[in-house]
Amino acid sequence: MASLTSAAVTIPSFTGLKAGRAPTTPSTSIKPPTPMSFSVKASFKEAIGTALVATAAGAVLASNALAVEVLLGGSDGSLAFVPSNIEVAAGETVVFKNNAGFPHNVLFDEDEVPKGVDAGAISMKEEDLLNAPGETFSVTLKEKGTYSIYCSPHQGAGMAGKITVN
């Protein structure tokens, strides 16, 4: 008895190609595009809303951020206010930032502030210190005039400065 085996052969087919014929041109009728419709998912709306609120809040904060930064201690290790002479507008905030890690404070000299200003009310308490780099003390000066400042632990080393409020 003989056995017959056949192998499966796959022949690729090409649609639209005909032997011995020129290609046909497609129909020229154009269908109007179907109108696109989409909806915004609630989570996307929330994300956009949050981004807009954050942007607006950032703009408000930036516009109100009229602050001058004064470093307590120089980058070279000097015991100084950097800069030591500061000019600000009335109502502007001065931010004192510990730059070096030495303990510092900011005191206003009661004899060298504009008349009617309570130096104790705008100074740090003498026993309070900014010990770590990055710690800050802020004060907003509203009265025009010249204010003398000093760091009580380093006053003897010359750590003093002036703020002029215009």
Swiss-Prot record:
Disulfide connectivity for this sequence is: none
Write the protein's name. Plastocyanin, chloroplastic
Q: Which PANTHER family match?
A: PLASTOCYANIN MAJOR ISOFORM, CHLOROPLASTIC-RELATED
Q: Report the sequence similarity comment from the record.
A: Belongs to the plastocyanin family.
A Gene Ontology cellular component where this protein is annotated is: chloroplast thylakoid lumen
Q: What does this protein do?
A: Participates in electron transfer between P700 and the cytochrome b6-f complex in photosystem I.
Please list the cofactors this protein needs: Cu(2+)
User: What are the Plastocyanin-like domain coordinates in residue numbering?
Assistant: 68-166
- Which positions carry the signal peptide feature in this UniProt record? none
Q: Which organism is it from?
A: Fritillaria agrestis (Stinkbells)
Topology relative to the membrane: Peripheral membrane protein
Residues bound to Cu cation are 104, 151, 154, 159
